[in-house]
């Protein structure tokens, strides 16, 4: 196994593409949380931070399908270079401004997201061109781990960068990372399109929607696919809702400064997630079924979310931070304990020819689904407080766990192959 990864990492073309992904992912996650901190410091409003998510989401919905269809129309190296350069330029120019309007933050988020709709599919389409087919599983694993790791690292260091270097300097660093991504992909060979422009565009756009429809039909007709997918989408909604409200959680629940609090949450949850991944492998070895893991960790997640709120009043005195660390740690552990078995179960139950149709459009569907919950949660937190919002999410998670334990197995068995 180690030899296989060494072979991939010894491929210079892959390394150039991977470095571009690493710098790009770090930048988008760091700037995301920098913008959250900036908006919250200026407005103190969870609605304002929720609108940042909407600014990122709109280009995904409006441009995503079109951008995905254009990937094979142009030289993919040129597309990667162009998007990286324009993203770096947009962040650099914004960082030069003195006291810009908060509306420009939303404009920059939309611009970055718009360009990202072209970068991400071009990156994914380039991977098979620079890596031999036999090494694709290892290459995809490295890309997935980089994506998840960049999210955790970006969340952790955004507050520290903002605290020690300031907002503008942190953005200059982000622009520098994107320029390094631009330089890295410039070393790739030209990846020219194979067919003419109009034909590729029509086929690409048609293929995107046909795959979406085919995936929808499979999902609707097979509860073994529908159930874990709904669970994963629900967890994605919860994660998005919590992420945009992190500054409010840090201020009102933990009583810490936003910069320090974000690093505290990232460290606690990240440590829990890492521990959870190790624990899962041990549970699998002793014979735990995926359904059992999902039910138990889902209940654990809901309970620790409620404990996080009920133990945050400050009445624990010096122990308050330690108890908060423990509850966040176990939330991270429980979250991974649900995500990994649910995703594995879904991968096993989707017929091989349909996996691309379901997973290829997962983030597109997740973005659409999260828009209204994010806005609704921001409004709830604004009007009634962040603790009520967190309590509602925790209660819903506990209820879902209860229904899954009570009726989940029968539901799956009765409709496993309905319509197939």
What do the predicted segments below correspond to?
Residues 2-58, 217, 221-269:
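Helix-loop boundary and gating motifs at the non-cytosolic
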Residues 10, 41-42, 72-73, 98, ...:
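Membrane-helix boundary and inter-helical linker elements of multi-pass secondary transporters
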Residues 11-12, 45, 101, 166, ...:
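Short loop-to-helix capping motifs
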Residues 15-32, 55-69, 75-88, 104-163, ...:
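Substrate-agnostic recognition of the 12-TM MFS/MFS-like secondary transporter fold
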Residues 36, 91-98, 158, 162, ...:
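Structural signal for membrane-spanning alpha-helices in multi-pass inner-membrane proteins
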Residues 52, 62-66, 73, 77-79, ...:
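C-terminal transmembrane bundle of multi-pass solute transporters/carriers
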Residues 102-107, 113, 138-198, 267, ...:
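Hydrophobic alpha-helical transmembrane segments
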Residues 187-214, 415-420:
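Flexible cytoplasmic inter-helical loops of multi-pass small-molecule transporters
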């Amino acid at each position: 196994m180690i030899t296989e990864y060494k072979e991939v990492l010894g491929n210079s073309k892959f390394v150039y593409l991977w470095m571009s992904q690493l710098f790009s992912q770090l930048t988008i996650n760091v700037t995301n949380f920098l913008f959250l901190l900036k908006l919250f410091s200026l407005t103190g409003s969870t609605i304002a931070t929720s609108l940042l998510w909407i600014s990122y989401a709109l280009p995904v919905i409006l441009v995503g399908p079109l951008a995905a269809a254009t990937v094979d129309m142009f030289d993919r190296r040129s597309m990667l270079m162009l998007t990286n350069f324009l993203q770096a330029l947009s962040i650099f120019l914004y960082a030069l401004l003195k006291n810009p309007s908060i509306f420009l933050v939303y404009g920059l988020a939309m611009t970055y997201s718009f360009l990202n709709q072209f970068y991400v599919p071009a990156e994914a389409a380039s991977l098979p061109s620079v890596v031999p087919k036999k090494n694709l599983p290892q290459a995809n694993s490295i890309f997935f781990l980089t994506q998840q790791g960049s999210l955790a690292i970006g969340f952790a260091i955004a507050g520290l960068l903002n605290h020690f270097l300031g907002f503008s300097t942190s953005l200059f660093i982000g622009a520098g990372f994107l320029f390094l991504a631009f330089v890295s992909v410039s070393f790739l060979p030209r990846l020219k399109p194979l067919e003419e422009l109009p034909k590729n565009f029509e086929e690409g756009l048609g293929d995107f929607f046909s795959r979406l429809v085919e995936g929808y039909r499979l999902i609707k007709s097979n509860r073994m696919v529908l159930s874990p997918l709904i669970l994963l989408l629900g967890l994605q909604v919860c994660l998005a809702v919590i992420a945009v409200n992190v500054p409010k959680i840090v201020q009102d629940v933990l009583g810490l400064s936003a910069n320090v609090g974000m690093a505290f949450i990232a460290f606690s949850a990240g440590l829990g997630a890492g521990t959870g991944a190790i624990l899962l492998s041990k549970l699998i070895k002793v014979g735990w079924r995926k359904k059992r893991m999902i039910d138990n960790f889902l209940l654990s997640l809901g309970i620790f979310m409620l404990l996080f709120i009920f133990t945050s009043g400050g009445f624990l005195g010096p122990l308050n931070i330690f108890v908060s660390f423990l509850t966040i740690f176990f939330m991270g552990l429980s979250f991974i304990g649900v995500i990994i078995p649910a995703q594995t179960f879904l991968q096993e139950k989707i017929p091989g020819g349909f996996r691309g149709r379901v997973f290829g459009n997962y983030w597109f569907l997740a973005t659409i689904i999260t828009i209204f919950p994010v806005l609704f949660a921001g409004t709830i937190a604004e009007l009634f407080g962040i603790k009520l919002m967190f309590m509602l999410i925790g209660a819903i998670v506990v209820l879902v766990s209860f229904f899954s334990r009570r009726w989940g197995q029968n539901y799956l068995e009765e409709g496993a192959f309905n319509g197939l």
